[in-house]
From Swiss-Prot:
It is an enzyme of class 2 (transferase). The keyword Nucleotide-binding applies. Disulfide bonds: none annotated. Keywords: ATP-binding, Nucleotide-binding, Transferase. This is Probable 2-(5''-triphosphoribosyl)-3'-dephosphocoenzyme-A synthase. Its EC number is 2.4.2.52. Belongs to the CitG/MdcB family. The gene is citG. InterPro entries: CitG, TriPribosyl-deP-CoA_syn_CitG.
Length: 294
């Protein structure tokens, strides 16, 4: 019974990734219609990546459940080691293309925290589907406790390094903390912004319209390291401003799709891709599935 419940939740994480890549049109991003601003990956590359990551999603939640009583830092280290193996497997499946590196990191922590939370709240194991807003907050607080050290440990001593990873370079140049920052703050972008917005949207609109509006909303608020890496601070600010204007227009579903298709070409021309917003879109879907919003 326990393994079946954990498996079903790990499959919700996979489903969240599938929903994210399938949602179309998404400006600058890979979707069912085109490859956005990416010339090195396609919809099928994402499918290959997700299949490679899927067994690790199961391992993340089982690890959290099995080691729920461990100190948060020890659980984090277990999850990170698993995550690094998952990353290697992903890169092998995609022939070196980075489809889900940051999202895999976030999912490792959230699935691990979900497993640990389930071990402490056994009623959810027998009545799956009763996840509440409070449960979501508790899971994110667990992630925060696991990652309280993360910024200092990973980014606090970069002055001694000569070569930087993509995420480290963003921090050194712009102070952007990326997925590490989201995790160490308890995913407040999700709990304080994305999920409240989506709960409201899904109560008023059909699922696909709600998902598209959520994407626009995230693009209007997220500190998007991918956009900044590709186009700099001004390009990122420009995208945020454009999306705020789009939200204010309150377009019909048909007109929203047309506007997003047009903006997709705009971002393709500038080689801009809001990958940070896309990752948070998938994470929002994960909790939306847990809370039965979708």
């Amino acid at each position: 019974m326990t393994k079946a419940v954990l498996t079903s939740i790990s499959q919700l994480a996979l489903k969240a990734l599938l929903y994210e890549v399938s949602l179309s049109p998404k400006p600058g991003l890979v979707d069912r219609f085109d490859n956005g601003a990416h010339d090195d990956m396609s919809f099928m590359t994402f499918i290959d990546s997700m299949i490679a990551l899927s067994p690790f999603f199961q391992a993340y939640i089982e690890t959290g459940f099995a080691y729920a009583k461990e100190e948060p830092l020890l659980l984090f280290n277990r999850l990170r080691q698993l995550g690094q193996k998952a990353e290697e497997t992903m890169f092998c499946a995609t022939q070196g293309i980075n489809t889900h590196k940051g999202l895999n990191f976030s999912m490792a922590l959230l699935l691990g925290a979900t497993g640990a939370y389930l071990a402490r709240t056994p009623h959810l194991m027998t009545d799956l589907g009763c996840f509440s807003k409070e449960d979501t907050l508790a899971i994110c607080r667990l992630v925060k406790s696991m990652t309280a050290h993360l910024i200092q440990t990973d980014l606090g001593h970069l002055n001694t390094k000569k070569e930087f990873t993509y995420g480290e370079q963003l921090f050194v140049t712009y102070g952007i903390k990326g997925p590490r920052g989201e995790a160490s703050e308890g995913f407040t972008t999700l709990t304080d912004h994305a999920l409240p917005y989506f709960r409201q949207m899904i109560s008023q609109n059909d699922p696909e319209t709600s998902q598209l509006r959520l994407l626009v909303y995230l693009m209007s608020i997220v500190e998007d390291g991918n956009l900044i890496h590709r186009g700099g601070i001004e390009a990122w600010k420009g995208v945020k401003a454009d999306m705020r204007l789009l939200l204010q227009q309150d377009l019909s579903t048909t007109d929203l799709r047309l506007a997003l298709s047009s903006y997709n070409q705009c971002l393709i021309n500038q080689h801009l891709s809001p990958g940070g917003a896309a990752d948070l879109l998938a994470l929002t879907f994960y909790f939306a599935f847990l809370e039965k919003l979708l």
